[in-house]
Amino acid sequence: GLYVDTKTLGTAFSLATTNPASVDTTNGSALFLDPLTVNMTFSGLSSTNSGTNGIWLDGVSGNLTVTGTTTSNNAGGHGILIENSDGTFNFNDINVDTPGADGIHINNTPSATINFNGTTTIQGTIGDGIDLSSAGGGVTFSTTSISGAGADGINMSNATGTYTFGGTTINGFEATNGGINFAGAAANATFGVTDIGNGGVGTAIDLSSTTGNHNISFATGSSIHDVALG
């Protein structure tokens, strides 16, 4: 994979690509950038059996685009981790399978713009399907499918910022968790047609203790079924 750690050595530089390239890695992260200013375009990213995170962006500024598919299989940590970053990130299709933590985890990105423009498919997580609880900024998902989450399907508890989801399907999450967890959130969120089901257990949407004058909306045609609490 592409591993750049300027923090440990105390160096600072920028990284750019002139032609889109792909990264396909086994037993490591496809990208580990910490911290870095970038102007990069990739045609695809793939990580299998990483001991940490499949894709790991920490303290990244600038622009990073993936025009093709980003894949993380069997990562020891998160499938995709974006943290402490203020860049603009554009992804196309996402496939995350059986990570050891969250499928996608976004943390401390109040000035970032993060777009998942294709179809995001996440399955078999130990943690949340998507964790936005400490993200901030603006995050967009075009089409999302989450199955077999080990905690929340989408965790937005205590979140701030603005979030836009297109069509969203959540099929299976931990019985003591929620399909979408907004507990304590102070965020604006718009969802397209959304379907949430969980084999008769769990809470579909948790709006407890949300704060401030914020808007959370779901498109007409959304459905909740096979849960303990709506």
Where are these regions (language model features)?
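Beta-strand-rich solenoid/repeat architectures in extracellular/passenger domains
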Residues: 1, 5-28, 37-53, 61-78, ...
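Extracellular glycan-recognition regions
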Residues: 32, 56, 131
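Residue-level marker of regulatory loop/turn positions in helix-turn-helix DNA-binding domains and
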Residues: 34, 83, 133
